[in-house]
Amino acid sequence: MTSDQNKAAVKKLVEGLGTNGSSSAFDVLHEDAVWTVMADANTFPVSGDMSRPAFIAHMRGFHESLPDGIHVSVTRVIADESNASVEATSNALLANGNTLNQVYHFAFELTGGKVVRAREYIDTARALSAFSR
């Protein structure tokens, strides 16, 4: 795939992590995709590798826990024929009444326009603070 096609694919996927995104966003994930949250499992409850089905189930559960959903905005995309990098922000009202304003970086590996590997970097301190206050 071309860099522009890969940019469009990962933008659709990342926007689809929000409840404001396309319902077909997860179609961008290859059936054997692995999604890794790059965080320390000893300090952050969502970390490590997830298969495509596990990641989709995790996101659906997360969406259901949010009273007003979550809005994800892509702020920058860089891509070539097999890799893409995405910066994004999100905001959501949590069930505990706190607001989560998060920043992300995603590194993707693509084959044939499908994401085969995703690495998600988030501000874990910001997330822990919002969920625990």
Q: Residue ranges of each PLM-predicted region?
A:
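Short beta-strand edge/turn micro-motifs at domain boundaries
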Residues: 106-129
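A short hydrophobic beta-strand element
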Residues: 81-90
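Short, low-complexity N-terminal intrinsically disordered segments enriched in polar/charged residues
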Residues: 1-28, 132-133
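Short beta-strand segments enriched in hydrophobic/aromatic residues
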Residues: 29, 90-92, 106, 122
